[in-house]
C-alpha cells in the first residue's frame, strides 16, 4: 500500500524534518514541506462525490407521535443510519426508538459508555461521510462539547438533539431553556459556532431534524436542535414528507474506497499562521450561515407589543397573543426558529411599529441576551423597550400570567 500523501507525518513530527537532513537555512515555521520533499507521492485519484438520491414516498395518513419519536423518524427519513449516544432523561425515548428501527434498516445503534465516547464516535462516523446523530439532555450535552469543538475544527457534520432540562448540576427532568447560552455561545473551546434550530411542535421536530442533516452536510459542521423536556414528550399530529434521502458519500469523506482514500480529516495546525488562516476560513463559513435565519411570525404585521419566545414557552405565548388581541391589545409573536444565527433581519422588518418587546422564556434571560446581542450587532439603535416574563428550574411561564403582565405593562422574574 502506497503512502496516500496526506502530509500528517510531516506536520506532526517532533523534529523539524524527521530523518531528513535539515537544510542549514531552514526556519521551521516558514518552511513548506512540499518544496523540501517534492510533490505528494500518491497514486490515489482525486476524490469523487457519490451524490444523494431522493426517494419518493407514498402519501400516507398523519401519525400521532411524541416529539422525540418524531425527531427519530425525521432522522431516518433524512438518511441517518448511525446513532451513538448514552441514555438520559428526558431524551432517552428518541434513542430507544432508533435502537428498534435501525437494525432492520441495516443501520448502527451503539450505546456508548458515556457521552464523551458517543461524541467521539460521531466524529469518526461523520468523518467517513456518514449521517449520524445523538439524543441527549443538558448534562449529557455539556459532556459532549469538547468533541463538538473537534468536529467543528475538522469540519465534520453531525446532528445533536439536546432535549433541555432543569439545571444547573443534576437539576431535574422538567423543561428549561437554560442551555441557550451553551448551544449558541459555548460549543467547546476555540472559535466555534453551529446552526441551532428550535422546534415548537412534534411536526417541527421531524421537519427540523431532516433540515438539520441537510445543513450539517451543506456546511460540513455540526447542527444542534434545541428542544425541551415537554416538547420531547408532547404528542401531536405529524405529517410525513413527500420524499426521503438515500445518502451518498461526499468527496471529502475519509472512506475506504479507492476514490476517497487520499482524504484526511484533522484539526491540527501546528504553525500559528496556518491555524489563523483556518480560523479565517471558519469565520467566512459562519458568515455564510447567516442566510439560514428562520423565524415564525404570528400576527406581527401590526403588532405594537411583540412577544419573543421559542420551544414550549412559545406555545403559551401564542395563546397569550390571541387573548391580548381579544382585549384590543395589538400583540404578536416572533418565534426564532434559528437561535443561531438569530433571525435579526426578520425581526428588523417588524420593529418600526413595535412599541414594546416582551421576552417569554424558561431561563435567566439567555434568549433575551441573544436578542439584545443580535440587535447590537445589526446596529439597531431605535430599540423598543424590552421586558420579560421568566421562570426557571422546570417552571414554565403560563398564558394567563403573560396576558396579565403584558396588559399591566409589567415584567416578571421569579
Describe every region a protein language model picked out:
Residues 1, 8-27:
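Iron-sulfur cluster-binding cysteine motifs and their immediate structural context
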Residues 174-228, 414:
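Conserved thiamine diphosphate
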Residues 220-297:
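Conformationally flexible catalytic loops at phosphate/diphosphate-handling active centers
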Residues 226-256, 348-355, 360-369, 373-374, ...:
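Terminal amphipathic helices with adjacent charged low-complexity linkers/tails
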